[in-house]
């Protein structure tokens, strides 16, 4: 066995010790470097994550806010940008500075069409992007069965809470959504009659009545929230005359405007979509029940304090400005009141610094001259679309646009293209941007017992009643008329006709027609014709029915086939 000398052993241990120190030093050095590199990598990752999060927030912030403002029963002369809105000297007929701003800076939809020109189905078109024949509430589908399977579109095309609406589509995009003002579209207690109707002469200060009104209001709020709206307030379940209590049958645009402003205040830091609907200039329009009314009277009951959103003092301010403009009467005070409400939204958007990223739509729910029918005076309406800096198309869009097109267009403008094929409506975003736009080759309309299609300047118009109604005896027609008259009298309105032999209406199957269509019944020369054909270019007032003119036989055939195509894609029957 070989022995190691102590001196060599000491040297070896010393060598190992020195090398261990070097190794440890290197290890610590590289470990430190590794920690530094790891920290730097983590820091970079955090920076990248933070950058990504900031980019996501920036992208979120770039989503345009949407304000969809829908007015009620406006006439063409109420828009100063039109020839009908000016007097013979070219001066504006109305004091509407905010609407004038929309005309100057936004896009006027020159050929704005409404599918179903009365309140409820028009709102259905806007909020769903679909034709009202697709309504699925129980009263609508039951009524279809009683009419031999033919859908009859009236004030019955309610949206059932839970169905997809403008609200739900925008919620899916990360928007906060609001619903303010007139409802008349989301089904709730007030529509289906599950709660006892307060007496017409009930006292809104009576504790029992207050309790009932509050119950109805909160149930309506819940149903609207179920329909895709985070915020639902300052609501009218219907027009003031239909609230069930005479003492509440007053307009209150201040209250509605307050709801819009409160919504913007609450959700100004989020992308938001606000649907706001006024009850004017629909009746009641007499000063005492409209612009001169007590601002504490609302659909919810009597407020303790009046809203303080619009120019103050409200009545005096409107009166003074209208008198200074020399425009008293003819409901122009109500138009200024309406304009003030739109102006209040603009001011709030500007104050909160979100106006530059907001798209505003102003839409009149339907034509008023022949409301309740598919004549041009009913289906022609008015609308603006506004955004800061305008759209490339300029101030006027000539392309025909339907109110079912609003929802897909707004979704398209908000960056959602995946849902665009789910609607009867079509996006016209490309037209607004001045790009190539195929547009529509025809326009479809439906209301009551009538259907119509417009193509290449011609309109085919058909009216059909169930066979059992056409076989009615005189006594049955008389009974129908009496029931309808009692119904109108139940909410303070008068009977329309007293003649059981009068032709049925197109909207309501009663002799002499219903209230909404009565103007057309009295004044349209071909109202009672079951088949009508018009050359809209040469006969825009639809006075000459060409249905039996052999010269237009081929045109009629083409239009009938076009109408059949629409009807075959929708629920219900309609015989052409």
Language-model regions, residue ranges each:
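Bacterial N-terminal signal peptides
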Residues: 31-39
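C-terminal motif of bacterial Sec signal peptides marking the signal peptidase cleavage site
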Residues: 42-43
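Acidic, His- and aromatic-enriched active-site or binding-groove loops in soluble protein domains
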Residues: 133-138, 195-236
């Amino acid at each position: 066995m070989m022995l190691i000398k102590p001196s060599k052993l000491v040297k070896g241990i010393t060598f190992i010790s020195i090398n261990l120190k070097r190794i440890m030093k290197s290890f610590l050095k590289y470990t430190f470097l590794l920690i530094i590199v790891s920290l730097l990598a983590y820091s970079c990752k955090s920076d990248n994550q933070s950058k990504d999060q900031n980019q996501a927030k920036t992208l979120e912030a770039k989503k345009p806010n949407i304000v969809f403002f829908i007015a009620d029963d406006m006439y063409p002369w109420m828009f100063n940008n039109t020839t009908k809105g000016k007097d013979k000297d070219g001066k504006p007929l109305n004091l509407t500075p905010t609407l004038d701003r929309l005309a100057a800076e936004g896009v006027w939809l020159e050929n704005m069409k409404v599918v179903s020109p009365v309140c409820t189905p028009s709102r259905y078109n806007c909020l769903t992007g679909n034709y009202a024949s697709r309504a699925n509430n129980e009263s609508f589908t039951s009524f279809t069965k009683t009419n031999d399977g033919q859908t009859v579109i009236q004030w019955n095309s309610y949206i059932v809470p839970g169905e997809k609406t403008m609200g739900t589509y925008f919620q899916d995009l990360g928007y906060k959504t609001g619903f303010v003002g007139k409802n008349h579209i989301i089904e709730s207690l007030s529509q289906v009659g599950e709660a006892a109707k307060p007496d017409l002469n009930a006292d809104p200060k009576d504790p029992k009545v207050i309790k009932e009104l509050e119950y109805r209001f909160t149930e309506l709020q819940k149903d609207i929230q179920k329909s895709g709206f985070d915020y639902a307030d300052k609501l009218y379940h219907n027009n003031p005359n239909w609230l069930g209590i005479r003492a509440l049958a007053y307009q209150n645009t201040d209250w509605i405007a307050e709801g819009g402003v409160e919504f913007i205040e609450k959700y100004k830091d989020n992308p938001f979509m606000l649907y706001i609907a006024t009850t004017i200039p629909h009746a009641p329009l007499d000063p005492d029940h409209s612009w001169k009314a007590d601002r504490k009277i609302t659909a919810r009951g009597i407020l303790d304090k009046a809203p303080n959103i619009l120019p103050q003092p409200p009545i005096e301010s409107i009166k003074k400005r209208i008198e200074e403009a020399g425009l008293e009467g003819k409901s122009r005070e109500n138009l200024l009141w309406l304009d003030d409400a739109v102006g209040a939204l603009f001011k709030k958007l500007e104050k909160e610094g979100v106006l530059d990223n907001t798209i505003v739509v102003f839409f009149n729910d339907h034509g008023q001259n022949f409301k309740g029918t598919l004549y041009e005076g009913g289906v022609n309406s008015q609308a603006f679309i506004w955004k800061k800096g305008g759209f490339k198309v300029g101030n006027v869009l000539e392309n025909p646009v339907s109110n079912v097109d609003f929802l897909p267009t707004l979704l398209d403008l908000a960056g959602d293209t995946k849902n665009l094929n789910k609607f009867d409506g079509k996006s016209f975003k490309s037209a607004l941007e001045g790009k190539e736009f195929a547009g529509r080759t025809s326009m479809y309309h439906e209301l009551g017992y009538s259907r119509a299609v417009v193509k290449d300047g011609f309109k085919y118009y058909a009216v059909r009643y169930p066979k059992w109604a056409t076989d009615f005896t005189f006594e049955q027609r008389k009974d129908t008329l009496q029931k309808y008259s009692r119904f109108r009298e139940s909410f303070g309105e008068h009977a329309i006709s007293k003649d059981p032999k009068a032709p049925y209406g197109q909207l309501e199957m009663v002799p002499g027609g219903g209230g909404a269509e009565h103007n057309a019944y009295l004044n349209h020369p071909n109202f009672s014709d079951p088949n009508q054909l018009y050359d809209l270019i040469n006969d825009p007032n639809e006075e000459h029915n060409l249905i039996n003119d052999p010269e237009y036989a081929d045109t009629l055939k083409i239009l009938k086939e076009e109408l059949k195509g629409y009807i075959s894609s929708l629920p219900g029957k309609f015989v052409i």
